[in-house]
Amino acid sequence: MIRVAINGYGRIGRSILRALYESGKRQQIQIVAINELAKPEAIIHLTQYDTTHGRFQHKVKLVDNHMLIGDDAIKILHEPDAAKLPWREMDIDIVYEATGVILDRQSCEAHIHAGAKQVLISHPSSADVDGTIVYGVNHDLLRAGHTVVSNASCTTNCIVPVIDVLDKHFGVKSGAITTIHSAMNDQQVIDAYHDDLRRTRAAGQSIIPVDTKLARGIERILPHMKDKFEAISVRVPTINVTAIDLSVTLAKTVDIASVNQVLELAANGRFNGILGYTDEPLVSCDFNHDPRSSIVDGTQTRVSAGQLVKLLLWCDNEWGFANRMLDTSLAMIAAKQS
């Protein structure tokens, strides 16, 4: 049994916990502790009730500063200094680092010094970590000596499996990406101050361009794609599910049917459970709570002049990513034991 702790219990932290109990991986992973500065009553309430994902299927109670879920008792901590967390006493194998602010190796090593054996960051990180993993594409690079690993981003997990499939079958020469991302909690409900002037504006009233490092994230997973991609991102007034508009120039001549065929085969084969394919006339809310990293919308595939291909990809940017956190952590332990 892997003993884990969650540091930072926001959207991703709570999704990780709920995904664990819904995924069938609870027999492999035990959440021992949650470190979150919010009040325990709020932690319990937001675990039980969620606007996006609905009510948690298990009853959650607060007893003696523990979250009780069935027979499981999860210690609730409120420690702002990661170096002071009781990971050694709790025998923590992996910390899910989900604060969104501890993103480099030196900061993550505070967890290691506190006694945790490994750290998995739920965010793109600095380049000095042991590895940035998109599960299903490069998790085989994990090694026993890796202590600090990044799970990349939800959009990197969405797009990289698709690029990988296209490159292996047709060769990818270059690409351009537009991420159409649901609003996030770094935006404002009504106009208010923010360092990014666009994010001073009400999230529910505008389509808001934001910076993205997605293209650089692709390069970290697929180094041979260096300088071949650029990306922009806009936030839209929905609370969950993201679409990615991907345009790629291929080395081989293709048509819509051949592109869709290789993606559907990959979804049913090598990337089963990670990549999906649909030809139904669906909309974003239909992918809410979908555990896969990416779903190709085959109805929107377009080909121009035989080599320029446009695709529409969907992902639940919370739930799919949380499930990959679980998968990557299991792969880290497997590598450590090999």
Curated annotation (Swiss-Prot):
Residues bound to NAD(+): R11, I12, N317
Residues annotated as catalytic: C154 (nucleophile)
Pfam families documented for this protein: Gp_dh_C, Gp_dh_N
GO BP term (any one): pyridoxine biosynthetic process
Compartment(s): Cytoplasm
Enzymatic class: oxidoreductase
Oxidoreductase among keywords: yes
InterPro entries: E4P_DH_bac, GlycerAld/Erythrose_P_DH, GlycerAld_3-P_DH_AS, GlycerAld_3-P_DH_cat, GlycerAld_3-P_DH_NAD(P)-bd, NAD(P)-bd_dom_sf
A cellular component term, taken from the record's GO annotations: cytoplasm
Matching PROSITE patterns: GAPDH
Site (Activates thiol group during catalysis): residue numbering on this chain: H181
This enzyme's EC code(s): 1.2.1.72
Binding residues for substrate: S153, C154, T155, R199, T212, K213, R235
SUPFAM superfamilies reported for this sequence: Glyceraldehyde-3-phosphate dehydrogenase-like, C-terminal domain, NAD(P)-binding Rossmann-fold domains
Keywords: Cytoplasm, NAD, Oxidoreductase, Pyridoxine biosynthesis
Complex formation: Homotetramer.
NCBIfam families: E4PD_g-proteo (TIGR01532), PRK13535.1 (NF010058)
HAMAP family hit by this protein: E4P_dehydrog (MF_01640)
Protein name as annotated: D-erythrose-4-phosphate dehydrogenase
Organism, scientific name: Shewanella putrefaciens (strain CN-32 / ATCC BAA-453)
